[in-house]
């Protein structure tokens, strides 16, 4: 402590040499340093309770705010977990819907292919029937044409071979046959 006084004394002496208007009194009792320190300690003691209660109130508010934030965080985490569960369920539903849609599309495609096969088979059957009918009609027409040509050829040959005497013989034989039948 003695060293401190000496330091103050040196500073005040040096400082007083530099500036005569400002001075440092090294006597504690005259300088009221002791009074200021007592006042300061008294203020600290009195204000300790006041500031302590203010700090306690502030601490309680901070703790309450932190607990509210933690509660909100917990609620947010719960909502997040619930949302994740809903997302998983939604993804499962989407997957199921996509699978069902794919199965339905395959069934529809197979149904269309089966119906197309049946329609093609019907068309083939109808085409075959049409071909058979057309062949029969063509065969009939060919037979009629051949018959007509044969009759025409025979009649032209008969006309060329049959003269008047031959016609008379045919007429006579036909008359005789008719008499015999009667």
Curated annotation (Swiss-Prot):
Keyword Protease: no
A GO MF term: ATP binding
Chain coiled-coil ranges: none
Protein's cellular compartments: Plastid, Chloroplast thylakoid membrane
Bilayer disposition of the protein: Single-pass membrane protein
Presence of the UniProt keyword Transmembrane helix in the record: yes
Classification via InterPro entries: ATP_synth_b/b'su_bac/chlpt
Keyword vocabulary terms for this entry: ATP synthesis, ATP-binding, CF(0), Chloroplast, Hydrogen ion transport, Ion transport, Membrane, Nucleotide-binding, Plastid, Thylakoid, Transmembrane, Transmembrane helix, Transport
Annotated transmembrane regions: 33-55
One GO location term (cellular component): chloroplast thylakoid membrane
Similarity comment: family membership: Belongs to the ATPase B chain family.
Subunit description: F-type ATPases have 2 components, F(1) - the catalytic core - and F(0) - the membrane proton channel. F(1) has five subunits: alpha(3), beta(3), gamma(1), delta(1), epsilon(1). F(0) has four main subunits: a(1), b(1), b'(1) and c(10-14). The alpha and beta chains form an alternating ring which encloses part of the gamma chain. F(1) is attached to F(0) by a central stalk formed by the gamma and epsilon chains, while a peripheral stalk is formed by the delta, b and b' chains.
UniProt function note: F(1)F(0) ATP synthase produces ATP from ADP in the presence of a proton or sodium gradient. F-type ATPases consist of two structural domains, F(1) containing the extramembraneous catalytic core and F(0) containing the membrane proton channel, linked together by a central stalk and a peripheral stalk. During catalysis, ATP synthesis in the catalytic domain of F(1) is coupled via a rotary mechanism of the central stalk subunits to proton translocation.
Note: In plastids the F-type ATPase is also known as CF(1)CF(0).
Entry protein name: ATP synthase subunit b, chloroplastic
Organism: Antithamnion sp.
UniProt gene name: atpF
């Amino acid at each position: 402590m003695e060293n401190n006084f000496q330091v103050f004394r040196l500073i005040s002496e040096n400082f007083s040499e530099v500036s005569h208007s400002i001075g440092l009194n090294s006597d504690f009792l005259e300088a009221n340093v002791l009074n200021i320190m007592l006042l300061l300690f008294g203020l600290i003691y009195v204000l300790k309770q006041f500031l302590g209660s203010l700090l306690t109130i502030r601490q309680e508010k901070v703790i309450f705010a932190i607990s509210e934030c933690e509660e909100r965080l917990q609620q947010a985490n719960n909502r997040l977990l619930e949302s994740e569960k809903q997302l998983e369920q939604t993804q499962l539903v989407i997957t199921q819907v996509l699978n069902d849609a794919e199965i339905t599309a395959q069934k529809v495609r197979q149904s269309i292919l089966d119906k197309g096969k049946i329609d093609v088979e019907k068309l083939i059957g109808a085409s075959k029937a049409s071909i058979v009918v057309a062949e029969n009609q063509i065969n009939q027409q060919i037979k009629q044409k051949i018959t007509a040509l044969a009759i025409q050829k025979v009649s032209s040959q008969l006309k060329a071979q049959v003269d008047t005497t031959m016609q008379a013989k045919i007429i006579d034989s036909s008359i005789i046959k008719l008499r015999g039948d009667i």
